């Protein structure tokens, strides 16, 4: 006979088959309830960490944009800045950050959000006006049916991006004049600038990138890229946090430039294999040594003479340059025996 020792405050456990099943069901129910309670409380536990990370992200974005504005004198006292808003994450992020910085900037400047509705089929024309109206800022929606023009000119199956871009650019320059704009702000970020550099190198035979500030091709406008220091992944995170009403960029049916896609994937692969390489390459764009390239229009090789003055950028001629060893993802370098 099975006997269970108990005290006065504890009931004897029923060890019969039915009793064991009932006991297991009670324990299972208790475990499920505990799991449900833990799951319900998890978001509350994660919230402070998410808030901290979001706050750090916001500070980083504002710092990087502010640094670019200062380094390249992008925005000056009294400027009227036209922010080109397409409905993508980058232009939303640019507008959002500039509005934040406008409140704390040491100078006064105006912001005008401008969108060009090119009458692409399926384009949700109500989204941007509603969003911008809620922000309570000055904005302008320019409606021009460039889509029909491009469809007539470009053969079926060919990319429409180039002509579409030229038409869009001309219209935006006109709008900038009409609105008395002094600076045109575009949402290109650090990754765009690096991709453009390699596109020019691989397919154009030029060491040419995407400048943070330039005079427009018509000679009449200053174009700025305040997101020059910002990584695309940070803009993606910020867009998710702010829940921007994103409008897809493929409504026209035209595929993104294949070459740009390939370069973008190459850079992502490099960054995955060699963490930090993207940052190093971007830094290189800001540290150009013309005397160590081969463009005779940028450096007077023919007129080179001995000066007797040491040059920090001068060649050591017989010595190979040494560089820090690249860190491989997941690989620990222990050192050599020599």
UniProtKB/Swiss-Prot annotation:
Matching InterPro entries: Rossmann-like_a/b/a_fold, TilS/TtcA_N, tRNA_Cyd_32_2_STrfase
Example of a GO cellular component annotation carried by this entry: cytoplasm
Gene Ontology annotations of biological process type: tRNA thio-modification
Keyword Ligase: no
EC number: 2.8.1.-
Catalytic activity entry: cytidine(32) in tRNA + S-sulfanyl-L-cysteinyl-[cysteine desulfurase] + AH2 + ATP = 2-thiocytidine(32) in tRNA + L-cysteinyl-[cysteine desulfurase] + A + AMP + diphosphate + H(+)
Gene3D superfamilies listed in its UniProt record: HUPs
Annotated motif PP-loop motif, positions: 86-91
S-S bonds: none
Coiled coil: none
Main location: cytoplasm
CDD domains (UniProt xref): TtcA-like
Pfam families: ATP_bind_3 (PF01171)
Function text: Catalyzes the ATP-dependent 2-thiolation of cytidine in position 32 of tRNA, to form 2-thiocytidine (s(2)C32). The sulfur atoms are provided by the cysteine/cysteine desulfurase (IscS) system.
Family: Belongs to the TtcA family.
Subunit-level organization: Homodimer.
Protein name listed in UniProt: tRNA-cytidine(32) 2-sulfurtransferase
């Amino acid at each position: 006979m099975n006997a269970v020792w108990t005290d006065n405050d504890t009931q004897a456990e029923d060890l019969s088959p039915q009793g064991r099943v009932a006991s297991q069901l009670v324990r299972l129910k208790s475990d499920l309830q505990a799991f449900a309670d833990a799951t319900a409380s998890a978001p509350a536990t994660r919230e402070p960490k998410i808030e901290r990370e979001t706050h750090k992200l916001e500070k980083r974005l504002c710092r990087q944009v502010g640094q670019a504005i200062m380094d390249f004198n992008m925005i000056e006292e009294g400027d009227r800045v036209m922010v080109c808003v397409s409905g993508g994450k980058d232009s939303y992020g640019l507008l959002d950050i500039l509005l934040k910085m406008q409140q704390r900037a040491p100078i006064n400047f105006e912001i005008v959000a401008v969108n060009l509705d090119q009458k692409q089929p399926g384009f949700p024309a109500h989204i941007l006006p509603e969003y911008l109206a809620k922000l309570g800022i000055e904005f302008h929606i320019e409606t021009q049916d460039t889509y029909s023009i491009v469809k007539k000119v470009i053969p079926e199956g060919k990319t429409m991006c180039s002509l579409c871009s030229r038409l869009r650019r001309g219209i935006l320059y006109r709008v900038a004049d009409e609105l008395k704009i002094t600076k045109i702000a575009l949402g290109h970020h650090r990754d765009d600038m690096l991709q453009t550099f390699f596109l020019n190198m691989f397919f154009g035979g030029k060491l040419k990138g995407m400048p943070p500030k330039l005079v427009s091709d018509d000679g009449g406008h200053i174009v700025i890229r305040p997101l020059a220091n910002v990584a695309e992944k940070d803009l993606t995170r910020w867009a998710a946090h702010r829940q921007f009403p994103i409008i897809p960029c493929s409504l026209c049916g035209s595929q993104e430039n294949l070459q740009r896609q390939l370069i973008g994937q190459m850079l992502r692969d490099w960054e995955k294999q060699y963490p930090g390489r993207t940052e190093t390459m971007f830094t290189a764009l800001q540290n150009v040594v013309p005397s160590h390239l081969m463009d005779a229009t940028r450096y007077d090789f023919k007129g080179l003479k001995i000066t007797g003055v040491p040059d920090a950028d001068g060649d050591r001629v017989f010595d190979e340059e040494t560089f820090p060893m690249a860190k491989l993802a997941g690989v620990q370098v222990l050192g050599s025996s020599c």
